[in-house]
Regions:
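Long, compositionally biased charged/polar stretches
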Residues: 17-609
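Fungal secretory targeting signals
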Residues: 1-21
Length: 609
């Protein structure tokens, strides 16, 4: 029985990895474990270059880094350049070693728990109904994912409200409000069905700014693996004036007979339509996070490594935020997105299409730096402060995210104002300006603020966004979230196992479309290994994002005080999120499940997986 890549095999694969100067991944028996990147000591005090009496040493260090830490071609699709060079390769290897160390206990638990889960369902006689999927979770996975699946995720998996509100929580990066001034209605829906479901017409919903679209039609270009199937769904959602809820209106498959489903269809037809959409959405979330958080934060930091002295305070902050970041894509290349690897074993589309998605989405959607600022992105998609439609009654991603974002920004503002007493001082920082120039030049960061930057506000925005990507945005789509919400079976399979229907009606059993016992446990165990439960006891949660002595002691008392306030704020937010309960309508944040995906006391401060 092969539930997962064994710990020994994974460790061997990673220990054999080397990134050559040309960026190709190859095998090597040499394992470099340098104690320091370049031999320069870790600073105890930070200083700007214009205030440093040993500027020559700074320049020597920067030149050495530029010579030995270089750009090499992207891996896992054509996204951002990766880290190479003699020292750069050592950094990657060092971070991979730490990553393997963190993975090992989780993988041990997941392997043991996966076998127990599989035995439990086999003892039951297999998956005979949709309710049987609960057996795969009950009493299992407490080691790898101590919190288990989100309350309400299984008991309410047929709920239309749950399906709709996941677009505003567990994967909030797809849905957008249709703008009646510039968009068109993407597909037609039977008028009688629309009136029955909404009390109005499709055109009226559109013109009032109450119609929303989540579009995965691009996946029609992808070819599923043998024995796997997928649609390429578009889904329409609407604001229901009668109930005050955000609800689904229709799902269009865009393959085969190109059927349009609505909640008025036979229950099995409609549930299958939601499952088909989720197959597309699950694929999107996992690869989008790679191109949006990993690829973007890595290249911004790599440009900083090559232009900032280790004595520069911004360098110190970035290295905290980018803890073990360069382990992920390099390891994923050999153990997750390799041909026949873990991704191929579970998802409808192979690693080839994961790479295609990353390549296609990085330059236009996932990778642009400024366009993906937290509030800017939500405004651009009409989800925040839209002038052409009513406010969303509930938006959990924004409700939780805004509090965390504001706290991060407040700390960063103090940090920047402490370093730079005026905008003029910032403009005179040659290393900082070199970083901005490098990011726009050799690093090829998409949509980065142009050089030079002239205000502290611009730097605050840059650093806040990096912190948001590494410590929050990443974990909404990855880390423990796929196990607890966005990958919970039976509603969220990684693939269909029967063809997309060519006609409606006559479906008596949805099990043929869903993974069998073995494939279900493989999916669950893969997602369990994304979690990192030990970060709580290791003080590596978001609450501790800035709590590192070298950074705090080297930048002044105001920064220490700002960190104390940040930790208090994160503690308050964590308590609020972790103690959520259902209200008297059986809802939490307007949803029939309890979402804790942004709990600062549980999620890492860094790009963990």
């Amino acid at each position: 029985m092969r539930l997962l890549l064994s710990i020994t095999s994974l460790t061997a694969a990673v220990n054999a990895l080397a990134v050559r100067a040309d960026g190709n991944v190859t095998s090597s028996t040499a394992v470099a474990t340098p104690t320091a990147w370049t031999g320069f000591p870790t600073p105890t005090q930070y200083a700007l270059p214009q205030n440093d009496q040993n500027l020559q040493e700074r320049n020597v260090e920067i030149k050495l880094k530029r010579d030995t830490i270089t750009y090499v071609p992207s891996i896992i699709g054509e996204t951002s350049l990766f880290m190479g060079g003699s020292v750069g390769t050592q950094i990657v290897r060092q971070e991979q070693a730490k990553w393997i160390q963190d993975l090992t206990p989780v993988q041990q638990d997941a392997f043991r728990e996966g076998n127990a889960s599989l035995k439990a369902i086999q003892d039951h006689g297999g998956l005979k109904t949709l309710e049987d999927f609960k057996i795969l979770y009950d009493g299992h996975w407490s080691g790898s994912v101590p919190g288990g699946i989100a309350q309400g995720q299984f008991s309410n998996f047929t709920s239309d409200l749950l399906f709709a509100m996941e677009r505003l929580s567990t994967n909030p990066y797809v849905v957008r409000r249709l703008n009646p001034n510039s968009d068109k209605i993407p597909f037609s829906v039977d008028a009688n069905n629309v009136t029955h479901l909404t009390g109005t017409t499709l055109d009226a919903l559109f013109k009032s700014g109450s119609l929303f679209l989540a579009d995965h039609s691009y996946q029609a270009e992808y070819t599923a693996q043998d024995g796997r199937y997928s649609a390429a769904c578009q889904a329409l959602f609407f604001l229901d004036e009668r109930s005050g809820h955000f609800l689904p209106l229709a799902i269009k498959t865009n393959v085969g007979s190109d059927l349009v489903y609505t909640p008025l269809d036979d229950p099995n037809d409609w549930l299958l339509a939601k499952i088909m959409y989720n197959v597309n959405d699950f694929f999107h979330g996992q690869i989008y996070h790679l191109a949006n958080s990993h690829a973007v934060a890595e290249i911004v930091n790599l440009a900083a490594i090559r232009t900032l002295s280790s004595r520069h305070p911004v360098f110190g902050l970035l290295q905290r935020l980018m803890f073990q970041a360069y382990a992920i894509r390099a390891t994923g290349e050999v153990a997750l997105f390799n041909p026949g690897g873990l991704f191929d074993q579970s998802f409808a589309f192979s690693n080839v299409y994961a790479r295609k998605f990353a390549t296609d989405f990085y330059p236009t959607v996932a990778g642009p730096f400024q366009a993906n600022y937290f509030e800017e992105d939500l405004r651009a998609r009409g989800l925040l402060n839209a002038s052409y439609g009513p406010e969303l009654p509930h938006f959990p991603f924004h409700e939780d995210g805004q509090k965390i974002f504001d706290a991060i920004r407040t700390f960063i503002e103090t940090f920047v104002d402490t370093i730079y007493e005026s905008d003029k001082v910032l403009t005179e920082d040659s290393e900082l300006q070199a970083w901005i120039t490098e990011a726009n030049g050799p690093a090829k960061v998409v949509d980065f603020p142009p050089a030079p930057i002239n205000t502290r506000k611009q730097l605050v925005e840059i650093l806040t966004h990096v912190a948001w990507l590494t410590g929050v945005s990443h974990h909404v789509l990855n880390q423990g979230e796929p196990f607890t919400t966005s990958g919970v079976l039976p509603l969220h399979p990684a693939s269909l196992y029967a063809p997309v229907p060519t006609a409606k009606g006559g479906i008596k059993d949805l099990l043929p479309w869903l993974p069998n016992e073995q494939k279900s446990v493989e999916q669950i165990s893969l997602l369990a290994r994304f979690n990192r439960p030990k970060i709580v006891e290791n003080n590596e949660t978001l609450l501790h994002m800035f709590h590192i002595e070298t950074l705090l002691s080297g930048t002044g008392e105001a920064v220490k005080t700002a960190n104390e306030q940040f930790m208090m704020t994160m503690g308050t937010i964590s308590k609020e999120i972790s103690t959520r309960k259902f209200d008297d309508q059986g809802l939490s944040q307007g949803m029939p499940f309890i979402w804790t995906g942004m709990d600062p006391g549980v999620i890492p401060f860094y790009l963990s997986v």
